[in-house]
Amino acid sequence: MGTLSVNQNKLQKRLRRLAGEAITDYNMIEDGDKVMVCLSGGKDSYTMLDVLLHLQKVAPIKFEIVAVNMDQKQPGFPEHVLPAYLKELGVEYHIVEKDTYSVVKELVPEGKTTCSLCSRLRRGTLYTFADEIGATKMALGHHRDDIVETFFLNMFFNGALKGMPPKLRADDGRNVVIRPLAYCSEKDIQAYSDMKEFPIIPCNLCGSQENLQRQVVKDMLVEWERKHPGRTESIFRALQNVAPSQLADRNLFDFTSLKIDENATPRFLDVLNI
């Protein structure tokens, strides 16, 4: 790729800045960390690797990057693409081979979405591998829009106010997951991926499943953003500004003990002079 245009340069700087802010805000990467960057071959994970490699050069701390891709034995998976790309970059990498494709096809009825089971199997395998190579952080390519979509999916279909945190300690206690692109929009990532011409690998297992609940939520957010620009960013900021006393979760706030404070100063409203 040649010299960047003004807009391309702004895009690159914006993604790097936002990723750097997210990493700093949530203390995602610390001095001496070994970061396992999970690559799927999609636009998000390629962008994440690209940004992290830059930050590795300019950050005031030292950390390792190890790229990992999981070959799930999907028919037609181009095994040569990622190794060739990573060798050209000079990045240490591992290809983890695990036939989760056959498991998913066997357990999920025809016509049903495979994403949930596929993701659980993949996550478990990657957690184990991260432990094996001594990775202290596991970086995933989820972005701001993914986080907002997950929030609505949980609210609409699971009756829970929870999303996809920028940083998470796994249930096993042995893995810390980070999402460096948590502040980045999908629109910017798509534009950056197009600009860099990353060798995208399509998902043959679930890429054609258009009637997913996530796609419905995504379409809803796209329409909201079209009518009210900035709404997705506003929703994301709301996830960073939670007021437990203004919700209804008794585990987060002790509503049962609320009583009048006899020592509080009364606030009188002079209704006659309104």
UniProtKB/Swiss-Prot annotation:
It comes from the Bacteria. One of its GO terms (cellular component) is cytoplasm. One of its GO terms (biological process) is tRNA thio-modification. Keywords: 4Fe-4S, ATP-binding, Cytoplasm, Iron, Iron-sulfur, Magnesium, Metal-binding, Nucleotide-binding, RNA-binding, Transferase, tRNA processing, tRNA-binding. Gene3D superfamilies: HUPs. Binds 1 [4Fe-4S] cluster per subunit. The cluster is chelated by three Cys residues, the fourth Fe has a free coordination site that may bind a sulfur atom transferred from the persulfide of IscS. Pathway: tRNA modification. A motif (PP-loop motif) lies at residues 40-45. NCBIfam families: PRK10696.1. HAMAP family: TtcA (MF_01850). The thiolation reaction likely consists of two steps: a first activation step by ATP to form an adenylated intermediate of the target base of tRNA, and a second nucleophilic substitution step of the sulfur (S) atom supplied by the hydrosulfide attached to the Fe-S cluster. This is tRNA-cytidine(32) 2-sulfurtransferase.
